[in-house]
Amino acid sequence: MTSTTSEPPKLQPSSYIPLMFALLTAVFAFQLNASMLSPALATMEDELGATTAQIGLTQTAFFTAAALFSLFLPRWGDLIGRRKVLVGMMAVAALGCVVSAIAPNVAVLLIGRIIQGVAGPTVPLCLIMLRQQVLNEQQYALLLGIVTSVNGGIAGVDALAGCWLAGNFGYRSVFWTMAVLCTIAVVAVQVFTKESTATETPRMDWEGVLPLAVALGCVLTAFNEAGKLAEANWFLVIILLLIGVAGFWAFWNVEKKVADPLVPVAYLKQRRTWALLSTTLLTMTGV
């Protein structure tokens, strides 16, 4: 006797078009935060009277913050609600855009860019939300491809728009544009997506988040400093790497003790876990 399982039906356009609009708007908002500013860096130097190194540091701060927030926000979304977390991310990112837009100096700009980094895990969170609402495998694969392709770049339009805005209205107009899109994303995600959580929602492992964030932050900063080669402060690189190792050691020990770990120790002991993480880390470091 054979049994057949029917594949879930595809969503109708009236259902998936609003959903995709909301998710793509959120992805657009993050992508603009990441790439739209690149053509405006020289303009920022002139208007703020800053050096190339200072402006470059603000970019590094954004991407480092994005990486750190990506460690725990998707998991937090599993526990308290993915839509709630994504809406909060977009709202905070919009606030960061406003701070950056009105920044009188590089120090305030740096703070604004760090706040904007909260949007870092936008894409994985959007893909999880998409999976929760699109149950048909074929349709999900197609829509997933659309979302991830947008994250790879908006056909160069983001860079061209950033260059045009900075050239005609100053670099602050770029941040105001980002803020508007983040605000639109807040409304779209709240209206057009459904709330979802994991099947089980235990307490968030904040004890594990802290040492892991410190460890990864130190390692990323060390790699960034080492990338300067002859101009690098190698003593600082060594200190940061040592702190990173200590942070990972603390994270390992915390995860062995908590009831609901951020990453189960059983996974940390598997070679395939470290092979995947190492490959990803080295690849992105090369980029």
Residue ranges and their predicted role:
Residues 60-74, 124-128:
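Central cavity-lining transmembrane alpha-helices of secondary-active solute carriers
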Residues 13-33, 37-41, 52, 56-61, ...:
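12-transmembrane solute porter fold
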Residues 115-149:
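Cytoplasmic helix-loop-helix junction between adjacent transmembrane helices
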Residues 163-280:
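Hydrophobic transmembrane-helix bundles of small-molecule transporters
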Residues 96-101, 116, 189, 283:
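MFS-fold secondary transporters
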Residues 44, 76, 164-165:
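Hydrophobic alpha-helical transmembrane and interfacial-helix anchor sites in secondary transporters
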Residues 47-49, 81, 101-108, 170:
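Helix-breaking motifs and short loop linkers at transmembrane-helix boundaries and internal kinks
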Residues 67-104:
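Conserved MFS/SLC helix-loop-helix module at the cytosolic interface between two early adjacent transmembrane helices
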